[in-house]
Amino acid sequence: MRHYEIVFMVHPDQSEQVPGMIERYSATITNAAGTIHRLEDWGRRQLAYPISKLHKAHYVLLNVEAPQEAIDELETNFRFNDAVIRSMVMRVKHAVTEASPMVKAKDERRERHDFASEANDDSEAGDSEE
């Protein structure tokens, strides 16, 4: 089986349907004896350019190992699902399991924010003791 990287973008008004879509597409892959190496829900993000007068979309990334039939079925599902505004399936040489740069940057921002809020709490506690 080959390795694929799949990204699909969902209409921002349909964001509440994303978990169900992820589950359905994941089931399509696993039912065809495929494996999911990485699944990332990037959330709602700004588009580089408007698509159908939309400026934001909900992004989902999958790295999978699956047979061609499962990939064909996924592409058909993407094409006929009106909530999916764009999708891209790329074949890659190896399975990718580490976090993507998008998730790494998000985690770093969260860590900096947590560190800053802890430093704020410490300085406020120091002020009240004096």
UniProtKB/Swiss-Prot annotation:
Domain of life according to the entry: Bacteria
GO terms (BP aspect): translation
Originating gene: rpsF
Keyword set, alphabetical order: Ribonucleoprotein, Ribosomal protein, RNA-binding, rRNA-binding
SUPFAM superfamilies found in the cross-reference section: Ribosomal protein S6
GO MF terms held by the record: small ribosomal subunit rRNA binding; structural constituent of ribosome
Bias-annotated ranges (Acidic residues): 119-130
Family to which the UniProt record says this protein belongs: Belongs to the bacterial ribosomal protein bS6 family.
Residue ranges with Basic and acidic residues bias: 104-116
Cytoplasm as UniProt keyword: no
Region of interest (Disordered), residue spans: 100-130
HAMAP family registered for this protein in UniProt: Ribosomal_bS6
Cellular component terms per the entry's GO annotation: cytosolic small ribosomal subunit
Role summary: Binds together with bS18 to 16S ribosomal RNA.
Record protein name field: Small ribosomal subunit protein bS6
